[in-house]
Amino acid sequence: MDYLKVLVEEIHSVVVATVDETGHPHTFVMDMMWEDGKTVYFLTADFKPLYKRLKEDERVALTGMTQRAGTMDRKSISLTGQVEWIGKEHLGELLDANPYMYEIYPTEEGRSHLQVFHFKKAVGDFYDLTQLPPYQARFEIEG
């Protein structure tokens, strides 16, 4: 199964956990925007607290699940690992795959603040309740 494709195309929105400089946890909702078969990519604006936290500490955990009618129709993925800031690299691919970003950031100046990250190393857990017994699998990202 292509877990990265499930994460980007079926789940898309996830809750991301980071820690601040004092070790306090923070969570954010964000979209997993693109995958290349090896890793997943996302972006944030350089004026947001999330950007600062990711630049200071690359450790991240996230969880997301598909939004279907009932619990037994859902799949979930959790990732724990390290992200890497890659600046504007692949920004065009992320924007092309997620055209709603042009509504959120309608001007070139607004989009100039967007910064791309990807997982450089992570362990993932996949859980599928659409079949019984539930299917579970572990996978790794070595971006």
Enumerate the predicted regions with their spans:
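Charged, amphipathic alpha-helical segments
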Residues: M1-D2, T44-L50, Y100-E103
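A short, Trp-centered hydrophobic/proline-enriched beta-strand micro-motif
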Residues: V6-E21, V60-G64
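Short connector loops at helix/strand junctions that flank enzyme active sites
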Residues: E9-I11, T27, E35-G37, K55-R59, ...
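A short, aromatic/hydrophobic, helix- or strand-capping loop or linear motif
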Residues: T18-D20, G64-Q67, P106-S112
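A structural signal for short hydrophobic beta-strand segments in well-ordered beta-sheet cores
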Residues: M32-M33, V83
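A short mixed-secondary-structure module that forms the rim of ligand-binding clefts
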Residues: M33-T71
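Charged, gly/pro-rich active-site loop segments
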Residues: K75-G143
